[in-house]
């Protein structure tokens, strides 16, 4: 008779434990009901990136001294630097500089260690193309600065959207 009583007690304890777990998960779900949605309508609304965001690399051709520090610090030896030595002035002359963003891991080492600060990170993150060879940017494409999200008149940022966060929190008043 005792095994049957202990079996009923174990069954009761397991039932209470299962009900408690279900109740905890239900309370978690209810606590998230009042939160605002995080989803944005991507092509029409964009988030403003932070100052430390690592987007596409910007390159200034006139500042580069062809020292190849960017190639040495890159974990995948990505930047391609073509230069020639001018013997009359005993300096390197930069011929071509390119980065393939299909391979780049956006670590920022090239920007950090560049002695002349000719490399910088921009806030551009839309690099999608239909052909992977279009992601190989030369010095001309790297020199173009992207349009800032804040200055782009075709994009509504989250801060300027007509449904601001304060309006979304307040429920509409219904008068009878």
Curated annotation (Swiss-Prot):
Binds 2 [4Fe-4S] clusters per subunit. GO terms for biological process: photosynthesis, light reaction. Its cofactor is [4Fe-4S] cluster. Its EC number is 7.1.1.-. It catalyses: a plastoquinone + NADH + (n+1) H(+)(in) = a plastoquinol + NAD(+) + n H(+)(out); a plastoquinone + NADPH + (n+1) H(+)(in) = a plastoquinol + NADP(+) + n H(+)(out). Its main location: plastid. It comes from the Eukaryota. GO terms for cellular component: chloroplast thylakoid membrane. One of its GO terms (molecular function) is quinone binding. Coiled coil: none annotated. Keywords: 4Fe-4S, Chloroplast, Iron, Iron-sulfur, Membrane, Metal-binding, NAD, NADP, Plastid, Plastoquinone, Quinone, Repeat, Thylakoid, Translocase. It holds the Pfam family Fer4_9. Disulfide bonds: none annotated. [4Fe-4S] cluster 2 binds at residues 74, 104, 107, 110. InterPro entries: 4Fe4S_Fe-S-bd, 4Fe4S_Fe_S_CS, NADH_quinone_OxRdtase_chainI, NDHI. It is found in: Plastid, Chloroplast thylakoid membrane. Transmembrane segments: none annotated. [4Fe-4S] cluster 1 binds at residues 64, 67, 70, 114. NDH shuttles electrons from NAD(P)H:plastoquinone, via FMN and iron-sulfur (Fe-S) centers, to quinones in the photosynthetic chain and possibly in a chloroplast respiratory chain. The immediate electron acceptor for the enzyme in this species is believed to be plastoquinone. Couples the redox reaction to proton translocation, and thus conserves the redox energy in a proton gradient. Belongs to the complex I 23 kDa subunit family. This is NAD(P)H-quinone oxidoreductase subunit I, chloroplastic. It comes from Populus trichocarpa. The gene is ndhI.
